[in-house]
């Protein structure tokens, strides 16, 4: 990636413990980029818990306009602010004229043991309540959001959350799930991380012991409740969440006549690392949201023209 991302170079003085910038080759390019305003936005949930988050506005934001909104939440219960970089960049969506709401719902680590343990043996229920309540409250307090044009996005456990949310609410007009888990049982038995992850997320619970947990919380067993246009993305060699998790939900939704598309990324694992494939993966997400949230289907149709076999 050296030819694509030209990094800053610093000289660090070990004795003085000071650093000085030697080169910043990207500065002329970055100076031309206008970023949207980002600020914290927290709300108090119905149970009294303060749920933290942030909002990111388009660079040329006009409070008198109506904007589509994208809601983003954690993957693997890792805080959305923990990583050095984030493939789901709020500023990227904001640059496309979306309001972005990033939420840290129940189950997120880094907010105390009780808070992080809320998703244990719940697999989405408490977290979904926070996301749905937070989204509704955000819209109530910000009239510039078009409530009929809200999308949601998550990956891994966040992909599971995207799928599960659509079985609980119809407030979203479009949804994107990357490497999501559709059946807790098959993930527990097949996924490279499945058994060890469930040792915490479903502590002391097993399919034969707690069948309701392993079925009722899976979107596959509730596919008939999904009405939101859903995009499934998955690397073909994902060793964390096997690609079958997306395949089986795609098949179920197709049988039910639901609106669903499935994009596979050949040769990629849980994270999309190849640069060119990552660009197409990003564009797939952006095109899907443009289709359903901005009434601009052309991008999607250009990328994935219909084929009649």
Where are these regions (language model features)?
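Structural motif
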Residues: 6-11
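N-terminal cap/lid segment of alpha/beta-hydrolase-fold proteins
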Residues: 23-64
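Short, small-residue-biased leader/transition segments that mark boundaries at the very start
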Residues: 1-5
């Amino acid at each position: 990636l050296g030819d694509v991302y030209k990094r800053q170079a610093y000289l660090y003085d070990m004795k003085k413990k000071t650093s000085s910038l030697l080169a910043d080759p990207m500065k002329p390019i970055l100076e031309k980029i206008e970023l949207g305003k980002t600020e914290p936005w927290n709300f108090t949930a119905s149970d009294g818990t303060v749920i933290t988050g942030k909002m990111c506005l388009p660079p040329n934001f006009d409070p008198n306009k109506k904007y589509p909104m994208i809601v983003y939440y954690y993957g693997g219960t890792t805080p959305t602010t923990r990583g050095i970089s984030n493939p789901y960049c709020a500023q990227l969506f904001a640059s496309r004229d979306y309001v972005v709401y990033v939420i840290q719902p129940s189950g997120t680590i880094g907010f105390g043991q009780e808070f992080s343990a809320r998703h244990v043996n719940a697999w989405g229920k408490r977290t979904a309540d926070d996301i749905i309540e937070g989204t509704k409250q955000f819209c109530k307090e910000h009239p510039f959001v078009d409530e009929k044009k809200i999308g949601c996005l998550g990956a891994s456990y966040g992909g599971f959350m995207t799928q599960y949310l659509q079985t609980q609410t119809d407030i979203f007009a479009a949804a994107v799930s990357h490497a999501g888990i559709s059946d807790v049982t098959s993930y527990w038995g097949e996924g490279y991380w499945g058994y060890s992850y469930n040792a915490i997320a479903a502590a002391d619970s097993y399919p034969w012991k707690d069948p309701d947990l392993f079925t009722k919380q899976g979107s596959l067993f509730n596919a008939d409740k999904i009405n939101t246009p859903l995009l499934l993305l998955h690397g073909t060699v994902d060793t964390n969440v096997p690609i079958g998790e997306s395949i089986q939900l795609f098949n179920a939704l197709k049988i039910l006549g639901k609106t669903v598309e499935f994009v596979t990324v050949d040769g990629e694992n849980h994270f999309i690392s190849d640069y060119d494939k990552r660009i197409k993966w990003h564009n797939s997400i952006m095109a899907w949201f443009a289709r359903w949230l901005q009434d601009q289907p052309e991008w999607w149709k250009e990328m994935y023209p219909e084929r009649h076999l």
